[in-house]
């Protein structure tokens, strides 16, 4: 069976509460709808984090969903707080998924034009397609358009596909 086919089609998105990850969540929700896939929203905490960090992670996931889609998501979605390193965990969670969507800055402190080490790792190690939603600060006009009810989470130039 091809990745992402059958009754458990999935689109995975990593969120951390940043504008870029919220744009990634909107993009992932749109893509899940277009693909008739289940949406999996992942927030990663360090492996040794305590229960309070996990509870905060679920609060952040709920906030991200409310912020990204004030009227609610139109697809079934699974929210998950996972433990580990963000990049490795997102690649593991995306195994067999049709798409992994992540947010990233266009320029990072690491010198990577598409963001930090999470982006680089996901692009290098994910088996499927990776979609990158880049620097949302540069797209304030788009945010205003969304507030006016027009769609679009990420500009097309911000996509990275493996």
Which residues does each predicted region cover?
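Short, surface-exposed alpha-helical segments at coil->helix boundaries
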Residues: 54-65
């Amino acid at each position: 069976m091809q990745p992402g086919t059958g009754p458990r089609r999935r689109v995975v998105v990593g969120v951390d509460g940043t504008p870029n990850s919220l744009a990634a969540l909107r993009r992932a929700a749109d893509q899940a709808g277009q693909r008739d896939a289940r949406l999996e929203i992942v927030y990663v905490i360090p492996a040794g984090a305590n229960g309070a960090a996990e509870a905060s992670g679920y609060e952040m996931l709920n906030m991200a969903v409310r912020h990204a889609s004030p009227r609610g998501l139109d697809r079934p979605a699974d929210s998950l707080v996972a433990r580990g390193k963000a990049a490795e965990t997102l690649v593991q969670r995306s195994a067999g998924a049709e798409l992994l969507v992540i947010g990233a800055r266009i320029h990072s402190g690491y010198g990577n034009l598409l963001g930090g080490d999470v982006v680089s790792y996901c692009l290098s190690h994910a088996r499927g397609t990776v979609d990158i939603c880049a620097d949302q600060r540069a797209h304030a006009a788009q945010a205003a358009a969304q507030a006016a009810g027009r769609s679009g989470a990420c500009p097309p130039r911000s996509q990275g596909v493996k």
